[in-house]
């Protein structure tokens, strides 16, 4: 009756089961020793092991992978009892077309995972200093590069960490400082195929960016009147630029609601249609710059607009005017690193914000081409240190999925990332994140992570408690597995990804 109830009511199943243990030895004496040890170990668990006298051949054939059961002695076990035996209780991660993430510490099987299969593709790579976080990140980038030939990988590199890997993979490293003439224009915009509604969306996004930029410089939220001035200036700048580009391409200017300002009409004869510029060349040659916004604020002629213009001056006439030039770098390479280590520390966050606005445009362009973009941001916690910038990051974190983009934040300063001031925004970021690579964590950081990631069991979190370098937990959606991504010190890939002389080779 009990068995019938378990089957009918509890949906249990029973199986005819044979459990055989195969062990080998070089000598008969060693064989006897192993047999005795196994029997003693089993007896501690109230199990009895018996030798297969006169049935060695049948037992051996049953153990082998032929799927033949010649050993006919069976016992009836329920599915719940069978679940206690390995490997049935071991979680595996083996996505089709996934990239390699090391060895599962429990089953010793390889881990293959694909972020594109997740509902929310964004991720975080977290680990304290010396945990192997940098090597893990570089290994992931290399696997992505080799396994996804159509995708583009973009890296924001505040510490000159990724240059050697990018160069080895024939990628492009762009170093930004006042001594080098590498320029990115955050105001670049592609108007190809953009109608009036699309123009309004672009104006809204660029106004949001400039508002965030000025707020980060002022270290405060902007007043409603200030926001109105900036919004009006951005509207004028991009509406005029849109109308001018329409004329350059021989399109009917009446299709938009804006006329070309007189000062821009003066330039039209120099920009003849005979130049036959490509879309990319038009974007670089004719997009507005921060100078246009700065001049627009001055043209407003009020004390408040002059104050806002003064806040922007460092990016126009000051030490960070490298962002006030037309783009002159090639962003077409599949692997591009933006090295901003040469920028001043007190302006690094603002510089990262400008770079992210530029990269958002690149991601949107890739999306039009049905191309995936992977954006890695090292020292990610710095972007959350300024409230206005954190809001911008949160918005991009949410919307990038629609543009076939994947953001991966990399950070080691967990205490900064998880402080009370950032808690609200971090919760919003984590709720839109399904990929986590957790390497070694301090006890304090582990407790905070357990609060933010309640779906990972305390037992699993033991794998990151002061773990060995190169080991930790990988969470992909609902699946969490402990990984071991240590590699041989003699391998070529180890020489490429290891930059600190220690690494986590074995």
Where are these regions (language model features)?
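Extended, folded cores of ATP/NTP-driven motor/assembly subunits in large transport
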Residues: 1-81, 86
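C-terminal regions of RecA-like/P-loop NTPase motor modules
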Residues: 1, 56-86, 128-129, 277-278, ...
């Amino acid at each position: 009756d009990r068995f019938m109830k378990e089957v009918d009511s509890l949906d249990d199943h029973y199986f005819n089961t044979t459990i055989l243990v195969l062990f080998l030895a070089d000598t008969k004496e060693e064989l006897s020793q192993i047999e005795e040890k196994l029997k003693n170990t089993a007896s501690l668990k109230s199990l009895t092991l018996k030798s297969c006298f006169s049935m060695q051949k049948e037992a051996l054939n049953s153990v082998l992978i032929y799927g033949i059961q010649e050993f006919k002695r069976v016992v009836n076990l329920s599915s719940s009892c069978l679940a206690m035996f390995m490997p049935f209780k071991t979680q595996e991660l083996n996505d089709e077309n996934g990239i390699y993430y090391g060895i599962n510490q429990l089953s010793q099987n390889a881990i293959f995972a694909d972020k594109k299969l997740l509902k929310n593709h964004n991720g975080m790579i977290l680990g304290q200093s010396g945990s192997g976080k940098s090597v893990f990140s570089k290994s992931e980038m290399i696997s992505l590069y080799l396994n996804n030939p159509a995708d583009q990988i973009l890296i924001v590199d505040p510490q000159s960490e990724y240059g050697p890997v990018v160069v080895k993979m024939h990628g492009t490293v762009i170093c930004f400082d006042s001594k080098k003439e590498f320029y990115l224009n955050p105001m670049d915009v592609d108007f190809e195929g953009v109608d009036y509604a699309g123009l309004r969306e672009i104006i809204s996004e660029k106004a949001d960016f400039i508002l965030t930029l000025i707020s980060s410089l002022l270290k405060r939220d902007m007043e409603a009147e200030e926001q109105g001035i900036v919004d009006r200036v951005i509207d004028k700048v991009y509406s005029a630029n849109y109308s001018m580009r329409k004329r350059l391409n021989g399109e009917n200017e009446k299709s938009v609601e804006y006329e070309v300002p007189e000062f821009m009409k003066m330039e039209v004869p120099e920009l003849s249609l005979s130049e036959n510029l490509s879309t990319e060349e038009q974007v670089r040659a004719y997009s507005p710059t921060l100078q246009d916004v700065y001049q627009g604020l001055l043209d407003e002629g009020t004390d408040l607009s002059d104050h806002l213009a003064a806040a922007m001056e460092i990016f126009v006439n000051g030490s960070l005017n490298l962002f006030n030039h037309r783009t002159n770098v090639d962003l077409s390479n599949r692997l591009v690193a933006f090295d901003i280590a040469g920028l001043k520390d007190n302006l690094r966050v603002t510089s990262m914000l400008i770079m992210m606005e530029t990269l958002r445009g690149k991601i949107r362009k890739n999306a039009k081409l049905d191309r995936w973009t992977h954006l890695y941001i090292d020292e990610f916690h710095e972007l959350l240190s300024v409230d206005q910038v954190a809001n911008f990051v949160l918005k991009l974190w949410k919307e990038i999925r629609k543009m076939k983009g994947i953001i991966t934040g990399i950070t080691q300063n967990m205490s900064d990332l998880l402080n009370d001031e950032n808690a609200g925004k971090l919760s919003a970021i984590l709720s839109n994140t399904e990929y986590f690579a957790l390497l070694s964590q301090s006890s304090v950081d582990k407790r905070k992570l357990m609060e933010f990631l309640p779906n990972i069991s305390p037992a699993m979190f033991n794998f990151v408690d002061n773990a060995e370098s190169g080991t930790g937990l990988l969470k992909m959606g609902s699946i969490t597995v402990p990984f071991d991504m240590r590699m041989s010190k003699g391998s070529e890939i180890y020489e490429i990804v290891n930059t600190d002389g220690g690494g986590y080779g074995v």
